[in-house]
């Protein structure tokens, strides 16, 4: 099984920790956050990883070499010349995901109790183009799913902005969840990234929302999903407690 880890971020929320190191190597409970994600993927049965790099990318390369790639096959998708955001990063790494086998994508700054093998297998059983692990929304930004857990749109509850263009939000008609930073993608999606809008830098969520009416993009909704965004200083201490439990 294959997976991709987003490790190219600038880590601006973690300054000054990221003034001299990449966000992916900021320690959490004595280990770099990248190591936590790699080991979680390895435990779930993933054997081949792609890791994108940008900010202090050479430190990530050295870290992986020093740890013998944790016994896995690891490829580097090098974005040191230009940061491509999540969608552009996935598209740049497309050459590592040939064939029809889906791959899991995981943010480096996320800790969770998600069973990654379960999320991956759930996607394969559904035979959909893409799948995201969702959790009850705690922010004003909500992904909107129908009763079959198919992605229909997005709304910002404070501003009432909606996506995609032309989407009309009807209260009470949707299951509303937050994006977890964990998703599974079928390589067939790369065929839909050929347009001008999907060149260079772009967020993957913009792509999902633009194509959700023509593709089958589903949600693996976990009401008991516990997730911590460790990309912020105030959550690092909570993350250490989370890992102890």
Per-region residue spans from a language model:
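Active-site metal-binding loops of divalent metal-dependent hydrolases
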Residues: 10, 108-110
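Glycine-rich N-terminal loop/short-helix segment of MobA-like nucleotidyltransferase
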Residues: 1-29, 42-44, 221
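Catalytic-core segments of class I nucleotidyltransferases/pyrophosphorylases
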Residues: 101-104, 111, 117-124, 137-138, ...
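A short, conserved acidic/glycine-rich loop-to-beta-strand motif
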Residues: 126-136
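Generic preference for hydrophobic
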Residues: 25, 76-77, 130, 154, ...
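Conserved beta-strand termini and adjacent loop/short-helix elements that scaffold enzyme active sites
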Residues: 54, 77-79, 133, 220-223
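Conserved N-terminal catalytic core of the sugar/cofactor nucleotidyltransferase
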Residues: 2-5, 31-107, 118, 198-199
């Amino acid at each position: 099984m294959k997976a991709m880890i987003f490790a190219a971020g600038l880590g601006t929320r973690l300054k000054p920790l990221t003034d001299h190191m990449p966000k992916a190597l900021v320690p959490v409970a004595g280990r770099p956050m990248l190591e936590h994600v790699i080991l979680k993927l390895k435990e779930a049965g993933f054997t081949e990883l792609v890791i994108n790099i940008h900010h202090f990318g050479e430190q990530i390369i050295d870290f992986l070499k020093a740890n013998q790639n944790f016994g896995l096959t690891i490829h580097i998708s090098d974005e040191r010349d230009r940061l491509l955001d999540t969608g552009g990063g996935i598209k740049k790494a497309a050459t590592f995901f040939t064939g029809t086998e889906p791959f899991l994508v995981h943010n480096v700054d996320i800790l969770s109790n998600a069973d990654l093998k379960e999320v991956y297998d759930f996607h394969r059983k559904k035979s959909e183009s893409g799948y995201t692990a969702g959790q009850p929304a705690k922010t004003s930004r909500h992904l909107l799913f129908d009763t079959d857990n198919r992605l229909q749109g997005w709304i910002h509850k404070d501003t009432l902005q909606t996506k995609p263009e032309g989407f009309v939000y009807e209260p009470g008609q949707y299951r509303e969840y937050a994006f977890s930073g964990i998703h599974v993608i079928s390589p067939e999606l790369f065929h839909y990234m050929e347009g001008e809008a999907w060149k260079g830098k772009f967020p993957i969520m913009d792509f999902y929302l633009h194509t959700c009416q023509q593709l089958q993009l589903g949600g693996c909704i976990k009401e008991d999903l516990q997730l911590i965004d460790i990309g912020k200083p105030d959550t690092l201490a909570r993350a250490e407690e989370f890992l102890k439990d």
